[in-house]
């Protein structure tokens, strides 16, 4: 059984701050899936800051609960049209997101943490997105198809 307890529109720090109540009690047969960083990049937070925070937190979490880290997909130009970012920031933001994804993948491998690379598995086509960043109904179905094989512990 899957139970979604997500935070949409949150930054990484918000996501990690919300975990304290969750981690205060034991959870059997639970896999914690976490994907974040895109909102931080869109807000202008430096990738090096995200990487330090993520590495510190996943090191702690990995000792408490089985993890699966989602590597975010890149953004499409629709995100400019819908107002999420400016045209001049689009290329830089996608480059930062790609570098952040490479960092996550390398560290998940080093730490033996399960990961799903949505940046390569998810189609980079506006047909799958509602706004160039967030999936639409068809996109969420595709996310679920990609993630399902990883969600058993």
Model-identified regions with their sequence ranges:
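Alpha-helical cap/lid subdomain in secreted, periplasmic
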Residues: 16-153
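Short, small-residue-biased leader/transition segments that mark boundaries at the very start
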Residues: 1-2
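Histidine-bearing beta->alpha loop at or near hydrolase active sites
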Residues: 7-10
